[in-house]
Amino acid sequence: MPNENIGFIGLGLMGSAMVSRLQDLDYQVTVCANKSRPNIEAAIARGAHEVETACALAQTSDIILLCMDTSASVEARMRGPDGVIAGLQKGAIVIDFGTSLPASTRALGQEVAAAGGYYLDAPLGRTPQHALIGQLNI
């Protein structure tokens, strides 16, 4: 089993496929609660651990993966007392797989760096089916 603690926020079509692939490779994944339950429940059924807030996820994750639809969604999960930045461990890596706005990405990168972490912008290419077999373009 790999040693990194992976936190994942955003289990839509692409995110849930990415989590499934990580679980296929024996990564321990922590997922953040969401109102939409089917993909969260599927990840939990395969061994994922669920936490209520992005802050709690960050407190136990070496690598935090974000797969959300808009910059506003990313910012909402990153900032505030329940956000990733509030719980970020020193040296943690945050990777945003969305197509976020450049100004938002730069601002979050600075905030994560100030908290002792690293922020990577890594938009995805291809489909959820490619994610399931580990063939995304990142």
Language-model segments: which ranges?
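Short, glycine/charged-enriched secondary-structure capping and boundary segments
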Residues: R21-D24, A45-R46, M78-D82, L108-V112, ...
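Rossmann-fold dinucleotide-binding core
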Residues: I6, T99-I138
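Active-site loop signature of alpha/beta-hydrolase-fold enzymes
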Residues: R37, S73, T127
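Glycine-centered flexibility sites
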Residues: G7-G15, G47, G80-G83, G87, ...
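NAD(P)+-binding Rossmann beta1-loop-alpha1 motif at the extreme N-terminus of oxidoreductases
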Residues: M1-L66, A131
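Rossmann-fold NAD(P) dinucleotide-binding segment
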Residues: A54-L66, T70-Y118
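Structural detector of well-ordered beta-strand residues that form the stable sheet scaffold
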Residues: T30, V51, V94-I95, L120, ...
